[in-house]
Amino acid sequence: MTMAPPRTLAGFIDQVGGRAACLAVSRDPNAKVTILLFPPGTTRPAYVAKVPTTDAAARSVEREAEQLAEVGSRALGPVSTTIPKVVATVEHRGRPVLIMTAMPGQSMLAAYHSWRHTARRATVAADFSAAGGWLAGLHGAAAGSGQASLAQLLDGAADALSRRFGSQPDVDADLADLAGLRGRLARHRTPPTVVHGDFWPGNLLIERGRVLGVIDWESARLAGPPAGDLARFVTSYSLYLDRHTRPGRRVAGHPGLHAARWGAGVEYAIDGAGWSPDLARSFVMTGLERLGVPASCWRDVLLADVAAAAATADHDEFAWYQLTLFRRLTGRR
């Protein structure tokens, strides 16, 4: 925009002119409304407004604005064109609204849920290739000096699980498993890099096998262990493989996977056999080797992401499911 942005969301929308479209209303406790803004005569949005509906969501919006500003100040090479730029922070009903540049591309999640997309090796491999290529670009350009322990993948997880589930049975055993996992991860270090923090298919915008945009940076870290992004992509991609399959049925394209208990797709990726688990593990192993970490610790990295999700997920029910999944993966079924 050529003039200073106004102070309110309504004023910003008036200044842009054209059309406005509500893209999504989140169901999370930190729920936000996403609005696309189309200048007159355009077919693609130029701006995205993220509008919080609760005080918790407002803090999330402020955090994302801060992280995007910091990330935007780094020299990240070609990857920088795929990261939204902060245009302004305005106000709506007493809460901050983040205005960002809109990114091109279609959500990888939309393609993921299209007919038989995840049943075909070629399409799944293309998704992993696109995600891996983008992460290699980010982590390579943003690598700092020094070393970051992989144990940082579990920073705060034990305390969070104690607060969240301390009254539930067997949590002491969970914490013991977590301590052992943290100890194993502490043996390995990588150069610290910018970390997205929630690198799942719903946050990737793609076109023709390339990532054109990555959104939702509120969980970003400016100097963290990049292995977390590798793990989050695999666990989140695998989690929904059985979404369109009736309970008890075999999942199309995956002979070793049946739609059974929650998290079956993640168990399949980590402990199952077939082309899909092979792709998932290869994705993590290749990424770890690129970061200078032995590929053999791929399983611990994925376990750490499941535990971290149990500690940090917005929904208590989702967090509990992640914790029970962690128990199964650590042998306590």
Locations of regions flagged by a protein language model:
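Conserved short submotifs of the Hanks-type protein kinase catalytic core
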Residues: 94-107
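Active-site activation/catalytic loop segments of kinase-like enzymes and analogous catalytic loops
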Residues: 228-287, 305-317
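A conserved alpha-helical element in kinase catalytic cores
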Residues: 51-95, 115-137
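Active-site acidic catalytic loop and adjacent metal/ATP-binding pocket
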Residues: 24, 32-39, 43, 182-228
